[in-house]
């Protein structure tokens, strides 16, 4: 809650230390906060001309197998199967843990309102935490599943890289 002006909200969002995006319930990409002069410096590369575009158009250059994963994330959140999907994009350079969090959003009446995405390099946060607490990471022999895990979320591949899921529809909107 608060009484921010539109300009204050814009400054607040632009100051966030991560990339934020929003796609509405009609699968239109409407907002991103980090307008870099060079989109290649972004983890989720976006340019101003994409605002207002359909998600299928924005991701249209992806190979079909990767597009199926984008469709799966959208469908999973749209259908309420999960509240969020978190991924780590494989193949990131050393010193980068490219993390994407896709979160379903809802209108006051409880109906689906779209997806917000938070993208950031988790490595500096992890390094800071380990330094501040004196802890360190140690190897293990199997996957780590924290208590209260979240469904079948795939934390080892990006939305564009996870296994094929075909039951989601990222090309039609709520009004189609």
Predicted features along the sequence, with ranges:
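Sensory modules in modular signal-transduction proteins
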Residues: 1-35
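Juxtadomain coupling helices with adjacent low-complexity linkers
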Residues: 2-5, 9-13, 119-176
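Sensory/regulatory domains in signal-transduction proteins
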Residues: 35-131
């Amino acid at each position: 809650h608060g009484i921010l002006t539109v300009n204050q909200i814009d400054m607040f969002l632009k100051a966030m230390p991560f990339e934020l995006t929003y796609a509405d319930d009609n699968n239109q990409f409407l907002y991103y906060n980090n307008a870099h002069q060079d989109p290649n410096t972004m983890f989720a590369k976006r340019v101003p001309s994409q605002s207002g575009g359909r998600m299928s158009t924005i991701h249209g250059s992806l190979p079909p197998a990767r597009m199926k994963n984008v469709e799966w994330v959208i469908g999973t959140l749209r259908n309420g199967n999960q509240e969020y999907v978190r991924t780590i994009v494989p193949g990131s350079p050393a010193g980068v843990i490219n993390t994407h969090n896709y979160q379903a959003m809802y209108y006051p009446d409880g109906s689906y309102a779209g997806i917000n995405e938070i993208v950031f390099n988790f490595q500096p946060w992890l390094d800071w935490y380990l330094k501040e607490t004196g802890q360190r990471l140690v190897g293990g022999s199997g996957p780590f599943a924290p208590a209260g895990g979240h469904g079948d979320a795939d934390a080892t591949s990006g939305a564009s890289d996870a296994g094929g899921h075909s039951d989601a529809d990222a090309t039609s909107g709520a009004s189609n």
